[in-house]
């Protein structure tokens, strides 16, 4: 392991001890925001400290095994060889883990997200598939203990959605869903197809981190135009009585957001403003990623909504992620929310991409 990496790890261990001490101070305990932030930092540092302690122990075991090789007892020498082999394997594994821990962390990984699903080419079938995708993400969210709420929805004529926007909140939502942005293609025989022909349709998915106050996304009130209108869709009689739905236009960028699912105009406005901040934050992230991709091509995480990232082939029971050439023949499980078999390989590919970049520097 490089000395620079060891020095970085040592500084993180010292920070872990410092944070541990701070968390027991009365002034910190009484300040909820500071206590929450420090608790998050402590949780992030804990596995690093654990892995580094195991790494240090493995180095000591290796040294002890080397010394045993000089023993005259043949049985002890064989034992030393076995221990040396195990120590080397542990060192290699832990060095790899520690390098990943030191990768630059996406500051938005802990953020909640806004999930937008829009029907693309394919007419009614695209709308139906957007509904299937929303169910898939809803089930995945449930499996991970996240919560999901619909912000706005435009239903398709034969089921599904022309567009549905939801908010997903919980632990590490963006870190797991950030690679879902892009075009999702489906190949299947629509229920309305009498000839049994396979149709190809597509939906676009956009995942945006919910903008926090600390992100510095400030919106000048003079830069927005707010319109109220009567909500439509689900909600019973209430929706026809008041102009509770909100549409906000950000004049400098032309970004438009709507919210009509909350019961009051005040709540709809708050939700719409939060979504607008997230869209502006995402625009900034997209700009940074474009600048980075000009210097190096990243296999994962470009977030380009026009990029076809995945195909769901129903006749073959196959799902293919085109960015990493991953093909799985368990489409039914994926559509029931078992997304980790796709998401985790994407995360690992992204980590490998970052490690390669670090090696080049």
From Swiss-Prot:
Annotated stretches, region: Disordered: 287-313
Compositionally biased spans, kind Basic and acidic residues: 287-297
List of residues that carry N5-methylglutamine: 237
Keyword Cytoplasm annotated: yes
GO cellular component: cytoplasm
UniProtKB keywords: Cytoplasm, Methylation, Protein biosynthesis
PTMs per UniProt: Methylated by PrmC. Methylation increases the termination efficiency of RF1.
Nuclease as UniProt keyword: no
Gene3D superfamilies: 3.30.160.20, 3.30.70.1660, 6.10.140.1950
Subcellular location: Cytoplasm
GO molecular function, one term: translation release factor activity, codon specific
Chief site of localization: cytoplasm
Similarity comment: Belongs to the prokaryotic/mitochondrial release factor family.
HAMAP family in UniProt: Rel_fac_1
Function: Peptide chain release factor 1 directs the termination of translation in response to the peptide chain termination codons UAG and UAA.
Protein name from the UniProt record: Peptide chain release factor 1
Organism, as annotated: Francisella tularensis subsp. holarctica (strain LVS)
Chain's gene name: prfA
């Amino acid at each position: 392991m490089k000395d620079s990496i060891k020095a970085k790890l040592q500084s993180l261990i010292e920070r872990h001890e410092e944070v541990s001490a701070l968390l027991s101070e009365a002034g910190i305990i009484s300040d909820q925001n500071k206590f929450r932030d420090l608790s998050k930092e402590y949780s992030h540092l804990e596995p690093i400290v654990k892995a580094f302690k195991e790494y240090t122990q493995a180095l000591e075991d290796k040294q002890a095994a080397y010394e045993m090789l000089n023993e005259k007892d043949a049985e002890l020498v064989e034992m030393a060889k076995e221990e040396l082999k195990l120590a080397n394997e542990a060192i290699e594994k832990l060095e790899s883990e520690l390098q990943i821990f030191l990768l630059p962390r996406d500051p938005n990984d802990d953020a909640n997200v806004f999930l937008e699903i829009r029907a693309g080419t394919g007419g009614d079938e695209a709308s139906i598939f957007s509904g299937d995708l929303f169910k898939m993400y809803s089930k995945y969210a449930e499996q991970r203990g996240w919560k999901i709420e619909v912000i706005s929805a435009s239903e398709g004529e034969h089921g599904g959605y022309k567009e549905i926007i939801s908010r997903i909140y919980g632990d590490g939502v963006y870190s797991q869903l950030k690679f879902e942005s892009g075009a999702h293609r489906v190949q299947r025989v629509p229920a309305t197809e009498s000839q049994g022909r396979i149709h190809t349709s597509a939906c676009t998915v956009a995942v945006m981190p919910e903008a926090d106050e600390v992100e510095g996304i400030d919106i000048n009130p003079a830069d927005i135009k707010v319109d109220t209108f009567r909500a439509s869709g689900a909600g019973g009689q209430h929706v026809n009585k008041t102009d509770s739905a909100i549409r906000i236009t950000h004049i400098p960028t032309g970004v438009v957001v709507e919210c009509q699912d909350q019961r009051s105009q005040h709540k709809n406005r708050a939700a719409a403003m939060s979504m607008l901040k997230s869209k502006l934050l995402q625009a900034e992230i997209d700009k940074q990623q474009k600048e980075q991709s000009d210097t190096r091509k990243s296999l994962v995480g470009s977030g380009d909504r026009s990029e076809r990232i995945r195909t769901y082939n129903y006749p073959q029971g196959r799902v293919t992620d085109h960015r990493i050439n991953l093909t799985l023949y368990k489409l039914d499980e994926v559509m029931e929310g078992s997304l980790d078999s796709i998401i985790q390989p994407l995360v690992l590919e992204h980590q490998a991409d970052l490690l390669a970049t670090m090696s080049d520097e």
